[in-house]
Curated annotation (Swiss-Prot):
InterPro entries: RFWD3, WD40/YVTN_repeat-like_dom_sf, WD40_repeat_dom_sf, WD40_RFWD3, WD40_rpt, Znf_RING, Znf_RING/FYVE/PHD. WD repeats lie at residues 471-511, 513-553, 559-604. It is an enzyme of class 2 (transferase). The gene is rfwd3.L. It comes from Xenopus laevis. It is found in: Nucleus; Nucleus, PML body; Cytoplasm. Residues 20-30, 121-142 have a biased composition (Polar residues). GO terms for molecular function: ubiquitin protein ligase activity; zinc ion binding. The keyword Metal-binding applies. Coiled coil: none annotated. GO terms for biological process: interstrand cross-link repair; protein ubiquitination. Binds 1 [4Fe-4S] cluster. This is E3 ubiquitin-protein ligase rfwd3.L. Gene3D superfamilies: YVTN repeat-like/Quinoprotein amine dehydrogenase, Zinc/RING finger domain, C3HC4 (zinc finger). E3 ubiquitin-protein ligase required for the repair of DNA interstrand cross-links (ICL) in response to DNA damage. Plays a key role in RPA-mediated DNA damage signaling and repair. Required to translesion DNA synthesis across DNA-protein cross-link adducts by catalyzing ubiquitination of proteins on single-stranded DNA (ssDNA). Mediates ubiquitination of the hmces DNA-protein cross-link, possibly promoting its degradation.
Amino acid sequence: MAQEEMEVDLPNLLGPMDSNRVSTSHQPLGSRQVLFLPPPITYSDDSEELFLGPTEPHDVIVLDSGEEAPAQVVAPTNPLQMLHGALEQLRQAAELRSSVRRTRVQRRSTRRQQRGGSQRTAGTSSRAALSSFFQINRTQGLAPTLEREERNTVLRTESLRTLPGDSSDETVELSEEEEGEGSSTDVDEVEINAGAAPPAEPAPEELQINVVEVQAEASAVSDSLPIPERVTLPLQIQTKQKTPVKLLSPVKPLPPEEDEGDTCAICFEPWTNAGQHRLSALRCGHLFGFTCIERWLKGGASKCPQCNKKAKRADIVVLYARSLKALDTSEQERMKSSLEMEQSMRRKAQLESAQCRLQVQVLTDECGKLRNQIQELKMLIAQHGTGTSVQASSSRSTISGSLSSSQGQHKYSFEKAILISQTGSCRVMSYCESMSCLVVSQPSPQTTLIPGCGIKKLSAANLKSSQYVPIHSKQIRGLAFSNRSEGLLLSAALDNTVKLTSLLTNTVVQTYNTGRPVWSCCWCSDNSNYVYAGLINGSVLVYDLRDTSNCVQELVPLGSRCPVVSLSYVPRAASEVFPCGGVLVGTLEGACFWEMKDDQYRPHVLPLEPGGCTDIQIESNTRHCLVTYRPGKNYNFVRGVMMELTSNRLNDSEDEYSCSCYPVQTFNAGSTCKLLTKNAIFQSPERDGTVLVCAGDEASNSAMLWHSGNGTLLQKLQADQPVLDICPMEVNQSSMLATLTEKMVKIYKWE
C-alpha cells in the first residue's frame, strides 16, 4: 500500500517570530515517519474560548513506506490549522464509530447463532484507513476552515454525548479484506473500546494497530495565542506489545441424557411408542428405533450396532410398550432359590422319615416273631425239663434252626409254565381269591368259529387251564375282580364296551357302551355297586350296577386328555397319614386322585414328573403306590418310584383334605421300554410288613424283585419274552407269583 504524507504548509499565517517557536512535527525514525497527533480540544463552561486539552500521552501512528522519508519536513506553523486537523480526526472517528455500531449488532446476532464455532479475527487495513484519516486539503483557506471547525465542534460534542450510552465492555472484532492495485493489504486486528473516554473530557478513539505507541510531552508552540494551556507535542517514545485478542469461552458440552435407556443407540434420539421411530428390538435383545435399525441393516451392515451379532431385517421385532423399566428381581430370585432349597430339604426329610417308618415296621414285626419263638422254646423247655445232653443238643439245634430260618432270605422258585396262546397277543391277567382262579386275556383260539377276544381260566390249586370264555370283539386292556364272592369279572376292551362276566356260568351278565375305547377298569372297594372305566380321551366313567343304561358320572381330566393307562381304587382307612378314599387315575402325563365323599368326587393332582408315566399300581394297606417311568431326557433307563400318599387338613376342617404324595424309594431297570407293561407292589409273603416291588425288564426279558425298604434287588425271574403283567396270589396259605408274556404264564412259589 502506498504511503501518503500529510504536510501542512502555513507560511503565510505565521510570522517570523512564531515560526521560530514551532518545532518540527515530523521526525524521521528509521525508515518510518512519525506523525504527532495534537491533544484533544475542549470548550470551557464559563466562556466560549477554545482550550487545548491537558497534556497527556497520545498514540503515534507509524506509517511504513517503501521510500525514504525526507530529512526535514515542514511543520505546521499555525495552531488553528492543528486544531482543524484534530476536529477532522474526530469527525471521521464519529463516522467510523457509527459504522462500528452497525457492524457490532450484525456480528452479535451472528455470534449467537454460531456460538461454539471457531472465530476468525481480522483487522482492517491500517494504512488505507490512516491515509484517509489524516488527509487535509492544502489549498483550503482560513475562513472556511474556521467555519468548518465550529460546525465540526458541534458535531463532535453531539457525538461524544452519545458515546457513554453506546459504550460497551465487549471487544468488537472487525474483519475486512481490501485489495489494491497489484498488491494486497495485510490483515490486522483492530480493537475499538467505546467506553475508554469519559464524558467530561472526550478523547479520540484509541486505535491499536499492532505498531509502536509513542508517549511524549509537548513543548510550547506559541505564547501569544489566547489559550489557557500550552500545546504540547509528543517527544518521548516507548514501545508496546500487541494486545492479545480476546477469545470467546469454549462451548460447554451439552449435558448427557438423564435416561440413556430411552434413546436410540443409532441416532441418540428418544424412541416412540408409535410412528416410524417406534421401539423395536433385534434377536440379541438390543433396542433401537424402527427406521434407524431398518436403514442400518439395509445399508449392508448385517450386524447389530451394539454387539455385532448377525442380524437381518426379518429379525426386527416391534415392541408394543409405553416405557421400559428394568425390574429388580434379585430379591425374588433369591427367595425362589431359598424356597427350592427348602423344598428339596423337605423332600429329603420326608424320604428319610418314610424309610425310617418302614424300617421300624420291619423291625417291629421281626421282634414280634422272635418273641413268639422265644415263648415257644420256653414252653418246650418247661414241658421236657432238663433232659439229657442229646435232648439239649437237639433243642439247641432247633433254636439255631429257627433263628436261621427266621433270619435267612426266602425267594420265589419256579413252579410251572402254562401255555396260553400259540399266536400270542396275551395282555393282562387277574386273580380271584375266593375261587382260586387266575384269568388271562387272550385272542380266540378259533377265530373262524368264535372271533374276538376272551379269557382263559387257570386253577391255582392244580395249576391247570380249564376253558376259554369269549367276552369282547377286540383286544382286552383291563381285568378286575370284585371283593365279593360272586365271581364277577369286570373287563375293558378297545371295542368301546365295559362288561361284567360271571365265572360261575361263564357268561356276560352286563354290558356298558362307553362310546370310546376303554384302556383300564377297576372296582370300588368301599361300595361294590360302582365300577370305573378309563377311556382313551382321559375321562373316567362311573357306572352303577343297579343302573344298566348309562354312566352315573364322568370325571373329566383337568389337564391333557391322555389315555388312562391304569385305574386303582384306594379304600378309606382309619389312618392319620391318608384317611381319604377314592380312585387313583394314571395317564401318560401324570396322575390325579379323585377323592370320593358322599358320592361326590374332588380332584387332587399329584406332583409327579411330567410325561413318561406308563403305569401306576397301589398297595392299599400301607398307602404306597408304584409309578413307572419310561426312559427320557434326564434318565436313560426305566425307573420305578415308590410314592407315599399323604393328606393335610384344610383350614382346621375335619372332613376336607389336601392330598399329595412324595417319593420314598427308586428302583432302576433296563434301558428299553416299548410296551405298556403292568407292574406290582404288594406285601411280603413273610407277613412282616415289608413291601416288595416287582417290575418287568424288557432289556433282559425278566421280572425284577426289589425290597422297598432298602431298595436292594432280591431276585431276578427269567422269562423268554418281555413280561407284560405280574400278579401275586395266595393259594392255600401259600404265596405265589404269576408273570405273563404274550404266549404263556409262569408260576413262582415263595419258599
